[in-house]
């Protein structure tokens, strides 16, 4: 594709349902994509994963990452695609040595325990140390339908920090929370360092072809309000503001799971949209943030493990709850789970499409 064609395609994507919804502009029907839409619920994903041999090889091989990114687009025709990668790539290239243990999830060979561990963290060059990610973005952009926007993403500084301190996942992230309390200066340094590195990483994704960006704050909800503002919100706000200064036309979605108490503060970061989990109604979120941001969400993922009738009603209820007017991107309240039958996603997509095309009427 020559430069003129590439520019034209970018402009067309800016007018897509997904991008218009993020700008709170009118659309013909509610756009839909799903968090973790490329994943283990799809047989084609499992086949590619088996071919790769392990998760890091899958995520770190541009051709394979492109293949699994495209699979849900080819099957369901979602209104947006999201890069297949992992939020822990950055600490991995900082030397913490990431691995994935079956049944246990991510593990780091090295962890953050002392202030010196933070001071010794390198600043990776995203076009060098994470070059495979950028090559995947470039390849996906080439292979995606020209009109389909591509979402780049990263983990929030706090969420990434939890894994770096704990050495893996945790039920309550007590070690990470204790680090904030006992080593607040080192913790702030860690969050600031991760914010700078994440900003560079996301800017590189934009330069490589991403049309929109998303920050996942999976574990902000484990923090007290004061700790959330100091160690989670501030890091995300720094990332949003720096990227917006350089790319005001690139929308940023913040998804902070379990953080309904902080919706107003999250909307004030300067982001264009907030992801909402299923513990908050869209109508309440909309009332609280007004017209400052679009909303994305928020179907409980377990609905997709039920029946077609339950899915149809739950989707209709979600759309009814948002109500009339622009600014809604349909999604789940968290990632799709491996036990979801692929045909249930067909029901989900069809119900969203039909609701907005007039084949379904709002429930009363």
Language model features by range: what are they?
Residues 2-3, 10-11, 119, 135, ...:
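Iron-associated oxidoreductase/ferritin-like identity signal
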Residues 2-102, 139, 312, 320, ...:
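N-terminal basic, low-complexity leaders that serve as flexible interaction/assembly modules and, when applicable
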Residues 45-47, 96-111, 163-174, 289-290:
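Short, flexible, mixed-charge acidic loops at enzyme active sites
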Residues 52-54, 115-125, 180-187:
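Short glycine/proline- and acidic residue-enriched helix-loop micro-motifs
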Residues 55, 59, 63, 119-130, ...:
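Short gly/ser-rich anion-binding loops that grip negatively charged ligand groups
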Residues 80, 109, 149-151:
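Short, flexible active-site-proximal loops enriched in glycine and acidic residues
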Residues 103-143:
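A gly/proline- and charged-residue-enriched helix-loop-helix capping module
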Residues 129-364:
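Active-site loop segments of alpha/beta catalytic cores
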């Amino acid at each position: 594709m020559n430069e003129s064609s590439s520019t034209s395609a970018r402009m067309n994507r800016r007018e897509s349902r997904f991008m218009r919804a993020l700008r709170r502009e009118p659309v013909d029907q509610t756009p839909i994509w799903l968090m973790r839409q490329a994943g283990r619920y799809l047989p084609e994903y499992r086949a590619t994963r088996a071919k790769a041999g392990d998760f890091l090889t899958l995520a770190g091989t541009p051709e394979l990452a492109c293949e699994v990114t495209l699979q849900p687009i080819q099957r369901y025709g979602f209104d947006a695609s999201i890069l297949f990668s992992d939020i822990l790539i950055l600490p991995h290239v900082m030397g913490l040595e990431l691995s994935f243990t079956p049944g246990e999830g991510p593990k780091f060979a090295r962890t953050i325990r002392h202030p010196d561990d933070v001071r010794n963290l390198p600043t990776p060059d995203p076009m060098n140390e994470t070059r495979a990610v950028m090559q995947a973005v470039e390849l996906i952009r080439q292979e995606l339908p020209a009109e389909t926007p591509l979402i780049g993403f990263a983990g929030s500084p706090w969420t990434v920090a939890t894994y770096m301190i704990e050495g893996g996942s945790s039920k309550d992230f007590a070690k990470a929370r204790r680090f904030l309390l006992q080593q607040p200066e080192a913790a702030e340094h860690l969050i600031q360092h991760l914010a700078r590195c994440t900003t560079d990483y996301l800017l590189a994704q934009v330069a490589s072809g991403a049309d929109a960006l998303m920050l996942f704050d999976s574990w902000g909800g484990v923090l007290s309000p004061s700790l959330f503002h100091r160690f989670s919100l501030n890091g995300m706000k720094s990332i949003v503001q720096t990227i917006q200064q350089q790319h005001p036309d690139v929308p940023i979605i913040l998804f902070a799971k379990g953080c309904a108490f902080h919706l107003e503060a999250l909307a004030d970061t300067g982001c264009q949209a907030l992801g909402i989990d299923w513990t908050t109604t869209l109508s309440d979120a909309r009332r609280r943030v007004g017209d400052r941001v679009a909303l994305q969400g928020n179907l409980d993922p377990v609905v997709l493990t039920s029946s077609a009738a339950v899915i149809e009603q739950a989707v209709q209820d979600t759309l009814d709850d948002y109500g009339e007017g622009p600014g809604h991107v349909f999604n789940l309240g968290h990632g799709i789970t491996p036990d979801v039958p692929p045909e249930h996603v067909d029901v989900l997509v069809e119900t969203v499409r039909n609701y907005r095309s007039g084949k379904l009427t709002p429930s009363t």
